A protein has these predicted regions:
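Glycine-enriched, solvent-exposed interface loops adjoining structured elements
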Residues: 1-105, 187-191, 223-366
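Polar, enzyme-active/binding microenvironments
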Residues: 7, 11-14, 20-21, 25-29, ...
Length: 366
């Protein structure tokens, strides 16, 4: 359970032999109580700034590209994806281009929304990470595709009733049509399920995926994934100065001749990221990882973004600030030494990764 602002403050007050606060008196604190509230926040800010790459602040996000758009905003609240937050540090080593996922709610995480009933009564099943249950039922969804482009389709099926039933996987230019693809997926290993991996070529700008179980037995679809049949490409990071000296003239020229699959990513001078070459498709997705800015505590019941293991480090640092306020240098030095030791232990156990050597030499045949 995450530690509340009130708990942190009272832990410091308790060790200082001062009167503690309650939820009802927290907003009306006085004297040393108010000072400790400020010192707890100050301690948290210092820890965030010192460690930065705290797992509790980690977020992974994605940005869809647009044809001809070179620069994109870095994360802010609920942008580019719902759940995003203002960033503190971007991990540019994680930028990669992945094919854009076309299916909406293809993982069935909490519901079967975005799917239309074709026949029967498709239902949600909470098994696994969430599944679409079909019992004498069918469901379909329309997708935006590009004519003559090849797409990769993956479907995982679980035979919940161990009946040996078959699932029809249909792709067509209308709901429940099979003019593009007609596959039958069966499960023989009832414990593990079965996965369909196949490809199809779109024949229109709108394509329909249909999942159909004609039998009165339970078949659960674990996930449906459709994207362009292209691989994942890691982007190399370069500095803005490097981009400006090498590619500025090409990228700023009013011509689409230089558009293509991005290979490089760089930070602009106005807190955005740029891609080179400029994307030539809307069907790329840029995925990357970052650490968000923490949320300051205000009310007594507010909880910190950090893991509870950070509680003692925050308390010790807040004690140090209080001892300095009280002009008690001996106690302050003891608290400082304890804080440094706690922070070092926490960093090694919680954040530092195992070190290893990697050979980056390139072998050239003589």
């Amino acid at each position: 359970m995450a530690t509340t602002y009130l708990t942190l403050v009272n832990n410091v007050l308790n060790e200082l032999n001062e009167s503690e606060l309650t939820a009802s008196t927290f907003a009306n604190s006085r004297g040393v109580q108010t000072a400790v509230k400020k010192f707890v926040l100050k301690a948290m800010h210092e820890i965030y700034s010192t460690l930065q790459e705290v797992p509790d602040l980690y977020i992974s996000t994605k940005q869809d590209t647009q044809v001809g758009q070179r620069v994109y905003d870095l994360p802010t609240a609920n942008s580019p994806q719902t759940g995003d937050a203002e960033y503190r540090k971007i991990d540019y080593d994680t930028f990669r281009i992945v094919p854009k996922e076309l299916v909406t709610n293809g993982e069935f995480t909490s519901a079967i929304t975005s799917w239309t009933t074709g026949s029967g009564s498709p239902a949600y099943n909470s098994g696994g990470n969430g599944r679409l249950r079909l019992n004498a039922a069918a469901a379909y969804q329309s997708l935006s595709t590009v004519k003559n482009v090849q797409y990769r389709l993956q479907v995982r099926l679980i035979d919940s009733s161990s009946s040996g039933g078959n699932l029809k996987v249909l792709v067509g230019t209308s709901a429940e049509a099979s003019d593009v693809l007609n596959e039958t997926l069966a499960v023989t290993d009832f414990g593990a399920g079965n996965i369909l991996n196949t490809t199809f070529t779109a024949t229109a700008a709108t394509t329909f995926i249909t999942l159909d179980n004609d039998n009165s037995t339970n078949l659960d679809v674990d996930y449906v994934r459709i994207s362009e049949d292209t691989g994942i490409k890691k982007l190399k990071y370069i500095t803005y100065d490097n981009w400006a000296s090498r590619f500025l003239e090409t990228d700023l020229e009013n011509s689409s001749e230089h558009y293509g699959l991005p290979e490089l990513v760089y930070t602009t001078q106005d807190k955005k990221f740029g891609l080179h070459p400029i994307p030539d498709k809307d069907t790329y997705t840029v995925e990357y990882e970052y650490w968000k800015v923490h949320t300051d505590l205000s009310a007594a019941t507010d909880t910190m973004d950090l893991n509870d293991r950070f509680k003692d480090v925050i308390i010790t640092r807040a004690k140090y600030y209080t001892y300095v306020l009280r002009s008690d240098p001996q106690a302050a030095q003891m608290a400082l030494a304890e804080y440094k030791l706690q922070l070092q232990i926490l960093r090694s156990e919680y954040i530092n990764t195992k070190a290893y050597m990697r050979d980056t030499r390139v072998h050239v045949n003589a």
